[in-house]
A protein has these predicted regions:
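Intracellular coupling helices
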Residues: 6-18, 22, 305-322
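Membrane-proximal extracellular/periplasmic loop immediately following the first transmembrane helix
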Residues: 37-108, 115, 222-225
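Mid-to-C-terminal secondary-structure elements
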Residues: 125-141, 152-283
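N-terminal membrane-entry
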Residues: 282-298
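Short, strongly hydrophobic transmembrane alpha-helices
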Residues: 16-45
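Residue-level signature of the transmembrane alpha-helical core
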Residues: 9, 24-28, 297-300
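The feature marks short, hydrophobic/small-residue-biased sequence motifs that occur predominantly
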Residues: 100-103, 110-143, 147-148
Length: 322
């Protein structure tokens, strides 16, 4: 019976090859575009190493600060280290909070006497290795004592290790990072650029550089972002409430100099953070979902029209019989 169905279908396709080819191609293209849109969304929110806990992440990449002397204006961008520690690292509800630089920076690495090559550098704290699950090939991440001491150690990817030392077994070996000597503490598997928060090729403690001095607005704004790891999604609301209380308490202190921090309902979960494109605007998740649904409907109309045309064509051929 099934073989007969395929035989009939093949015979009908051969009767009108042009219409059949156009209909099949149109349907296939529509399905391909739908899959593409879905995949583009999924890579932003679906968990995968080293961001396997995306469903428990809350992010604060940027914020705003205003001053009573600015006439309603605001400064927008990443926060300073002091702000990150006072407002987020002090939270009690989350499982962990990590502070890191707001973006990777292309930085030269080389061995003494050899030409340099550019890598993507991310500066972090020791909690970073608890929040994100990297696959270590050799060695281990830097710990709290190493971080607090500001020791020049680094975790590098396998590809960087092979580029510098021609082997992934590079623990304890030294290299120059932006002309400063660093020692390899660990080697991890290469990280996809789709892991937008954890991605890097070399990770070092931010206490080993001068990045925390790159600040403005009396050190309240700077170059730092943070990610909060909740124990479960059920804690999101409690974490946001605690973060808001800390903001209000901190604003009392800042108010002595006329400053006020503005969060715009941060911290954001993974979905909301993935569509945020500026510090001074809160993304509309519902509107973004509606736009995505409209795209799906439009793309589904194409195969629906194709199938209707095929059915109508077949009916015209059988009018005499009907």
């Amino acid at each position: 019976m099934i073989k007969q169905y395929f035989t009939q279908a093949w015979a009908q396709l051969r009767q009108q090859p042009l219409i059949s080819a156009v209909s099949i191609a149109g349907t296939a293209l529509a399905i391909f575009l739908i899959m593409l849109v879905v995949m583009m969304q999924q890579v932003k929110v679906a968990p995968f190493a080293p961001e396997s806990n995306r469903d428990r992440f809350l992010h604060v990449h940027y914020m705003s600060i205003t001053n009573k002397n600015w006439g309603g204006g605001s400064s927008n961008g990443p926060m300073g280290l002091k702000t990150a520690r006072e407002c987020f690292q002090s939270l009690k509800t989350p499982e962990a909070v990590t502070i890191y630089t707001c973006m990777v920076v292309s930085t030269p690495v080389n061995l003494p006497g050899q030409p340099g090559t550019g890598i993507d550098l991310l500066q972090t704290d020791d909690a970073f290795w608890h929040v994100f699950d990297f696959s270590f090939i050799a060695g281990k991440p830097y710990d709290r004592a190493t971080f607090d001491a500001g020791q020049p150690v680094a975790v590098i990817t396998e590809s960087v290790a092979r580029r510098l030392f021609q082997t992934s077994d590079a623990i304890g070996r030294e290299f120059l990072l932006n002309h400063a000597p660093y020692k390899v503490a660990g080697v991890v598997k290469d990280v996809s650029t789709l892991a937008t928060v954890a991605y890097g090729q070399v990770w070092v403690p931010y206490t080993s550089t001068e990045i925390t001095k790159d600040t403005w607005s009396d050190e309240h704004m700077g170059m730092m972002s943070c990610t909060i790891l909740a124990r479960s999604r059920d804690d999101f609301e409690a974490i946001r409430e605690e973060a808001e209380r800390r903001r209000q308490e901190y604003n009392v202190i800042l108010g002595e100099d006329g400053y006020e921090l503005i969060y715009r309902n941060r911290p954001y979960d993974q979905e909301k953070s993935s569509i945020a494109f500026s510090a001074n605007q809160e993304p509309d998740v519902e509107q973004h979902r509606r736009q995505r649904m409209i795209i799906f409907i439009i793309l589904l109309i194409v195969p629906a029209i194709n199938l209707s045309s095929m059915t109508q064509s077949r009916l015209r051929q059988r009018v005499a019989e009907i």
